[in-house]
Amino acid sequence: MEKLHFKEMGSGQKIVIIHGLLGSSDNWITIGKKLSENFHVYLVDLINHGNSPHTEIFNYFRMADDLYNFFHFNNINKAHLIAHSMGGKVAMKFADIYQNHIDKLIIVDIVNKGYPTNRFNYIFNALKNIKTKNIKSRKDADQHFSNYINNLSERNFLLKNLK
């Protein structure tokens, strides 16, 4: 059980927001700030994303349990849950298991169906084949990613996650 990293703002009814694959809480900061004018907002980094711990166990059941523990550690009995893409899959699993903890469920850009498991292989190949000792700058990383990923926006999204 890992403690998830999060950003917190505002007061009132609680809203928990979860990012998508390869994203982080930073993806929702603008919307979170706006919502915090009327709500108590939590922007959560799922495991293996953002500033949350990294682990080899990575599946929807595990992430739903991590989210349950996040609710517990932060004394959240019930909240509105907003989730994007892969985070939406986590939120749906959470709602299935822990429905009493959800007030409203808002899923963005994903449906409850199976998707091809190879859909993002080109991105995972780029990440798997990076030689970190050869990367001295974001430009070096972008050059590596460009061998696998043609779309500049996708490369920039990956580059945002570099530390």
Regions found by a protein language model. Give the residues of each.
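Alpha/beta-hydrolase fold catalytic core
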Residues: 1-15, 36-39, 76-77
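Active-site glycine-rich loops that stabilize anionic/oxyanionic intermediates
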Residues: 12, 20-23, 85
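Alpha/beta-hydrolase active-site loop signature
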Residues: 22, 46-50, 112
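Active-site loop/oxyanion-hole signature of alpha/beta-hydrolase fold enzymes
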Residues: 29, 33, 42-82, 86
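Flexible "cap/lid" loop of the alpha/beta hydrolase fold
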Residues: 92-97, 102-136, 142
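Conserved alpha/beta-hydrolase catalytic His-Asp/Glu region
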Residues: 118, 133-163
